Amino acid sequence: MAITKKLIDGLIVTIQNLYLTDDIPWMIGYSGGKDSTAAVQLVWMAIEQLPERYRKKTIYIMNTDTLVESPVVSKWVDKSLKFMKDESEKKGLPFVPIKLIPDYNNTFWVNLIGRGYPFPRKKYRWCTDRLKIQPVNNFIKNKIAEHGEIILVLGTRKQESSRRNRTMTNLEKKRVRELLSPNPTLANEL
């Protein structure tokens, strides 16, 4: 599918309509990669175009620092989050960039050296859950406890792989509201 101005304009209108539908806070997963950056950019453009009086619902931009990232990558992400925070405040936008970290009992080095876990590999990826997923899930659970439910925005592409395509197609079949699918692992997360 070609990316055109018409497509982007349509996405912006869809995002605006979803945003204005309710008071449920949004969370955007942001790694700094192309898919999550596109998701942040589209939501940002959509909300920025709304009149200020409608920009009331908080949108958290979540990044997880595994504490073993390259210093160059880590510094770039920190600058990116700071830039988003500063611009959001300057423009009266409801974005709250936040950097999450794993619990210190679940850091890479505690598990590798302290607990003797083998180095992560394709068939034994213990690090993904502990370093990235758990910090995000803990943050989301706290926000669900505070607000009742949340809407999670992820930048994903069906074209990334056949497995991703199947997963996304199956989630689309479970939609409970227009364009929103329930998270099978966390209650009250769409």
Identify the function of each model-found stretch.
Residues 1-190:
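ATP-dependent adenylation/nucleotidyltransferase module used to activate substrates
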